[in-house]
């Protein structure tokens, strides 16, 4: 059984309420529930953290190494375009990760096109709404050698 950490960045606590035309009507609790069901079926354990504070996400990444977390799925949200510190934390713990986004960041404002994570991630999944997380989890299962 692998442990997979799912990190949700700033403002994702407002999913379902904030700009539903861009981010959809699905709540963060709904996303986490779906992922938990998928992980249970595959025999894995998921941990979650949503934070609007960069340092909390960094601390959780550091703790993941100590805890033996096997994989990270991260939606850095607005930190995608600004956080060298989060990038360095992920590189520092040497845990494979997938970057995920609900919206297609490449169809949005130009400042959203740059990511500090995509060049060091196992992969990037964006533009499929809440399904982006499910696709990321399926990819994590494959990378970990688990049947999907």
From Swiss-Prot:
Keywords: Amino-acid biosynthesis, Aromatic amino acid biosynthesis, Lyase. GO terms for biological process: amino acid biosynthetic process; aromatic amino acid family biosynthetic process; chorismate biosynthetic process; quinate catabolic process. Pathway: Metabolic intermediate biosynthesis; chorismate biosynthesis; chorismate from D-erythrose 4-phosphate and phosphoenolpyruvate: step 3/7. The record marks 18 as: Transition state stabilizer. InterPro entries: DHquinase_II (IPR001874), DHquinase_II_CS (IPR018509), DHquinase_II_sf (IPR036441). CDD domains: DHQase_II. Substrate binds at residues 75, 81, 88, 102-103, 112. Disulfide bonds: none annotated. PANTHER family: CATABOLIC 3-DEHYDROQUINASE (PTHR21272:SF3). HAMAP family: AroQ (MF_00169). Belongs to the type-II 3-dehydroquinase family. Homododecamer. Catalyzes a trans-dehydration via an enolate intermediate. This is 3-dehydroquinate dehydratase. It comes from Cellvibrio japonicus (strain Ueda107). The lineage of its organism: Bacteria, Pseudomonadati, Pseudomonadota, Gammaproteobacteria, Cellvibrionales.
């Amino acid at each position: 059984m692998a442990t997979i950490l799912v990190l949700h960045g700033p403002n994702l606590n407002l999913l379902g309420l904030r700009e539903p035309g861009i981010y959809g009507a699905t709540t963060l609790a709904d996303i986490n529930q779906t992922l938990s069901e998928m992980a249970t079926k595959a025999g894995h354990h998921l941990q979650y953290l949503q934070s609007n504070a960069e340092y909390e996400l960094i601390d959780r990444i550091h703790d993941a190494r100590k805890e033996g977390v096997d994989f990270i799925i991260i939606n850095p949200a607005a930190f995608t375009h600004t956080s060298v510190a989060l990038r360095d934390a992920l590189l520092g713990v040497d845990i494979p990760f997938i970057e995920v986004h609900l919206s297609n960041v490449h169809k949005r404002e130009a400042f959203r096109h740059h990511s500090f994570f995509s060049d060091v991630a196992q992969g990037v999944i964006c533009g499929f709404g809440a399904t982006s997380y499910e696709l990321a989890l399926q990819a994590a299962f494959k990378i970990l050698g688990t049947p999907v």
